[in-house]
Amino acid sequence: MKKNNYKIVSLYSFFSFQENSIIELKQNLLRIEKENDLSGLLIIASEGINGTICAEEKIIENILNLIKNIVGNNQLNIKVSYSKEKIFKKLKLKIKNEIVTMGVPEINPLEDAGTYIDSFNWNKLIKDKDTIVIDTRNHYEVSIGSFKKSINPNTKNFSEFPQWVDNNLDNHLGNENSKNIAMFCTGGIRCEKATTLLKNKGYKNIFHLKGGILKYLEDISKEESLFEGECFVFDKRVALDHELKKGSYSICHACGMPISIEDQTKVEYIEGIQCHFCINKFTDEDRKRFEERQKQINKLKVKNQEISNN
């Protein structure tokens, strides 16, 4: 495949997804995967669709047309990037209760989400002294990049966010209930639910970054950007820089934490087995399993390199 010939589309939409349409889409996607070089991860639920797909441009367009026919008049939020190689091993389709798991089934982003702020007006909003900025992502995502002076809820997963709101948000607001609350995430989907949650709890002046960090990095020049670091993504690229190209981070295959080039020079780091985040987390038996897995990965790398050289 030629340079940057993989088109990557991150997408989501909230809409009433009927069971027969879910089954039909799943069958069509599996058929396309069987006949083409398609990979990705799509999560499907009765509330909509969420995920990322990776393939040649014409295949991507065919899939988007399928999805748009189902979504109908509801907005399909899309972010596009490109890669020299596949960012997933294969296509995974998951049918779940929620397309992004918050664990608060009564909220509906279609009815009561916050106010969108586009990339070009975001800087002005978060610079306002009467605005607090909340990063709704998980702690390991925040650790490698975020907007200046944003609040880190330090959650392990998104389902912890409602409890953080109950325990902490009023402390950040103080007695100033008129403050703006600006929220952001990777692509926008978590903020659809996070802003709806806050509005349902009676908070006012709730805003969220339309298209998330990915759209902001696409729209705003590096010189004007208030985003610092890299943006974590849930695929082989691990993180993206301001040009939406693969960044400098890798993943520790033992604990799943993003690790920098500097982290990989630390004495605690052994590729595929441990890093400084997890050195005390696993048993010797675990590490033996990780070591064997890494041996198999290395063998596969050598084999693939030999094939590409021939």
From Swiss-Prot:
SUPFAM superfamilies linked: Rhodanese/Cell cycle control phosphatase (SSF52821)
Catalytic activity field: uridine(34) in tRNA + AH2 + O2 = 5-hydroxyuridine(34) in tRNA + A + H2O
Pfam families according to UniProt: Rhodanese (PF00581), UPF0176_N (PF17773)
UniProt GO molecular function: oxidoreductase activity, acting on paired donors, with incorporation or reduction of molecular oxygen
Gene Ontology BP terms: tRNA modification
Lineage: superkingdom: Bacteria
Domain spans labelled Rhodanese: 127-225
Functional note: Catalyzes oxygen-dependent 5-hydroxyuridine (ho5U) modification at position 34 in tRNAs.
UniProt similarity note: Belongs to the TrhO family.
Descriptive protein name: tRNA uridine(34) hydroxylase
Source organism of this protein record: Prochlorococcus marinus (strain MIT 9515)
Gene: trhO
